[in-house]
Design a protein with these regions (language model features):
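Non-catalytic interaction-recognition regions
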Residues: 1-250
């Protein structure tokens, strides 16, 4: 349910200004497909309405099937129209989706561009986000090894509590940070091999280490303000081999 997902988003410190649902774009999707058909952007084929992508060097895809039902492709132009309407003049709409949908977006972007070049040309981008793998391999619903984000964070939290003496609240904060940073530190087109032990390591490229470093730096800065030091150093009296950049750091 939406309530369940909203609870998850709150736990991850995530927020969405607007959620779009597929059912919103059924009727408008068919209307736009018919408009595109009249303009010659789409064409009929074996009872369906398709986009022939050959002349553009991209795939041919179905927008309305032979039963008269819009496909995902058929509803996408209606979604784009709504997004550009809801948020006004946009510089770029970024779709963060797996690489398997590359063909889908190439086709729908092209159709939308042909419908309204001024509005859509070069205004949309498919940001490929690769799959996540655990040590057991790639997650797959077909193989039954899909895991939920909440489960993953809970497992990370358990490990943190096992290895440290922190309280429940601190463990929760570290677990969320460790999980999120493990995703963010990788390039979007790199398959993520999630390792719980690596994610909570107190050294190296991990959230706990970065948080620790930040806290230590804050502590040093706080203590330095209490020290009675001269605001300037008479460098002419200091005999050293330090260069100007090094002296500026001092």
């Amino acid at each position: 349910s939406l309530k369940y997902f909203e609870q998850n988003y709150k736990r991850f410190y995530s927020h969405f200004d607007r959620c779009y649902f597929e059912s919103e774009f059924y009727e408008r999707g068919i209307e736009i497909v018919k408009e595109a058909l009249k303009k010659g952007i789409l064409e009929k084929s074996q009872g369906a309405i398709i986009f022939n992508g050959k002349k553009y060097g991209i795939d041919t895809r179905v927008f309305v099937n032979s039963l008269g039902l819009p496909t995902y492709e058929g509803k996408e132009p209606a979604l784009a129209e709504k997004e550009f309407s809801d948020f006004g003049e946009l510089d770029k709409v970024i779709h963060v989706v797996t690489p398997e949908q590359t063909s889908f977006f190439k086709v729908t972007f092209k159709v939308e561009e042909l419908l309204d070049e001024k509005k859509y040309k070069d205004k949309q981008y498919h940001l490929i986000y690769e799959w996540v793998k655990l040590k057991a391999g790639k997650m797959s619903s077909r193989e039954g090894n899909i895991i939920e984000a909440n489960w993953l964070i809970d497992e990370v939290k358990k490990k943190i509590l096992e290895k440290s003496k922190c309280d429940e609240e601190t463990a929760e904060t570290l677990a969320v940070a460790s999980t999120k940073y493990s995703f963010l530190k990788n390039g979007t087109q790199t398959i993520i091999h999630f390792d719980i032990d690596e994610s909570i390591a107190v050294d190296g490229n991990s959230a706990p280490y970065l948080i620790y470093t930040y806290v230590r730096c804050q502590s040093v800065l706080k203590k330095s303000q209490k020290l009675e030091v001269k605001s300037q150093i008479l460098y002419s009296k200091v005999k050293s081999n330090l260069n100007n950049d090094e002296l500026n750091v001092l």
